[in-house]
């Protein structure tokens, strides 16, 4: 059961992220999202400092990493997983995945306070991203493609459904990368403002996460991604994630 302070923080972050979604595609989205991530970063730092003070700054007695298992299903599974991987990395966690029929099982390792923050952000950002992507369109129409109809002897236009699916998958990947960058920036800002002690604590958190992953999955290996992304769609997702400009197709 979460305490009152945590609940208050979560309510504030959830409200900010809902406000960000309401103004998606505008500079205001960046302001709301950055503030939400800043609150999450400060909360994580406070919890780290509390744990350190309880242990007399003896980091050897700080909590070990734990495992959290979640599933990614539905549309654009591989691209969705990039959002979780990116946020986990920004929040000092490690991930490994196993492919399933129609989805992925993702194992996440991190100290409890980071896992808690990741679970909360994932519960908001993942459904938000999937709602937003349904309105994504390229700024320029797809170039028409034709196929020959042997029955009529004429060329007929091909459906653009496959191109749109590829574009949206790429948008998710770009959006996920931008979210990771913004979340990482807020984490770094919080740690730098707190001084060297926080840096030592967070470095230890990453080491604990990496150790837990190696112990649970000793034969894990890196696999090169096989998904190809539409460069325009990826860039579109990054722009919408960073909100560097206003006039995007997302605003519909």
Swiss-Prot record:
Annotated protein name in UniProt: Gene 77 protein
Organism annotation: Mycobacterium phage L5
């Amino acid at each position: 059961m979460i305490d009152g302070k945590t609940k208050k923080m979560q309510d504030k972050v959830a409200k900010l992220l809902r406000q960000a979604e309401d103004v998606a595609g505008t500079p205001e989205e960046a302001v709301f999202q950055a503030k939400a991530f800043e609150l999450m970063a400060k909360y994580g730092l406070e919890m780290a400092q509390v744990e350190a003070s309880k242990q007399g700054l003896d980091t050897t007695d700080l909590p070990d990493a734990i495992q959290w298992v979640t599933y990614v299903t539905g549309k654009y599974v591989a691209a969705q997983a990039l959002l979780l991987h990116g946020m986990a990395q920004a929040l000092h966690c490690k991930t490994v995945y196993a492919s399933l029929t129609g989805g992925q099982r993702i194992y996440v390792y991190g100290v409890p306070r980071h896992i808690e923050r990741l679970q909360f952000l994932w519960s908001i950002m993942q459904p938000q991203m999937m709602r937003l992507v349904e309105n994504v369109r390229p700024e320029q129409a797809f170039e028409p493609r034709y196929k020959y109809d042997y029955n009529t002897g004429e060329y007929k236009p091909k459906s653009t459904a496959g191109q749109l699916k590829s574009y949206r998958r790429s948008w998710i990947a770009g959006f996920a990368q931008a979210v990771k960058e913004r979340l990482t920036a807020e984490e770094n800002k919080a740690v730098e403002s707190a001084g060297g002690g926080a840096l030592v604590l967070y470095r230890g958190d990453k080491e604990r996460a990496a150790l837990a992953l190696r112990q649970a999955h000793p034969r894990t290996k890196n696999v090169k991604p096989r998904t190809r992304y539409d460069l325009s769609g990826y860039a579109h997702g990054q722009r919408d994630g960073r909100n560097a400009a206003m006039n995007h197709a997302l605003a519909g």
